[in-house]
Design a protein with these regions (language model features):
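A short helix->beta-strand "capping" segment at the edge of beta-propeller domains
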Residues: 1-11, 40-42, 183-184
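Short, solvent-exposed loop/turn segments at conserved positions within beta-propeller repeat blades
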Residues: 30-31, 70-71, 115-126, 164-167
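A short loop-to-beta-strand structural motif that recurs across blades of beta-propeller domains
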Residues: 34-36, 74-76, 126-129, 168-170
């Protein structure tokens, strides 16, 4: 049986950080500074405005939403009373923060550009931030070439990171405290750039 595709919703500028949650697809329309939720019926709800460009999305175990704020390198938390800074990523993120994945314990792994790639400067590798549920930020891994696009395996024991300018997917073992070890090549996608060409 052939697959049939159709447009569910349109009118967006540049969508990033898709996450499925509570029966809807949540996305960051980063160049329009807003977080949206798209229903299976095509309805679109504006969840949050983020003038510093939203990117990665996730949820804490209690249901509160986390949103990466790119240009000011902050992790925002959507509380009942409004939006609060959950963590400051500027000590680790050397340029814009980007994608994120949140585990079942509320720990967030957050990537960043590493450098201003639009400036024409050579690739500069960067670190991956681990944000604990209390907002404490530590370095989870080093020397990643534009980590942007991450997943945790269903058992939560392996983190896979797309290194856009490394042209590879890198895997790590996840310990009980969220720390990463046993870095290894999970897949090489040379000459394709993951997350740029749709890989």
């Amino acid at each position: 049986m052939p697959l049939v595709t159709s447009v569910l919703a349109d009118g967006f500028v540049f969508l990033e950080g898709p996450r499925w949650h509570d029966g809807r697809l949540f996305v960051s329309d980063m160049h329009d500074d807003r977080v949206l939720a798209v229903g299976l019926d095509g309805s679109v709800e504006r969840i949050l405005d983020v003038p510093t460009q939203p990117s990665g999305l996730g949820w804490l175990p209690d249901g509160r939403m986390l949103v990466v704020s790119m240009t000011d390198r902050k992790l925002l938390r959507v509380d009942r009373g409004g939006v609060a800074v959950h963590a400051d990523l500027s000590g680790i993120a050397t340029f814009h923060a980007n994608d994120m994945v949140v585990d079942g314990h509320g720990r967030a792994y957050v990537g960043n550009f590493g450098w201003d790639y639009e400036s024409g400067a050579p690739v500069r590798k960067t670190a991956l931030a681990l944000v604990h549920p209390d907002g404490r930020v530590v370095r989870a891994a080093e020397d990643l070439a534009f980590p942007n696009g991450m997943v945790l395996t269903p058992d939560g024991r392996t983190l896979i990171v797309a290194e856009t300018f490394g042209q590879c997917l890198t895997a790590f073992d996840v310990a009980g405290d969220g720390s990463l070890s046993n870095r290894r090549l999970w897949a090489s996608v040379d000459p394709v750039f993951p997350d740029v060409t749709g890989a």
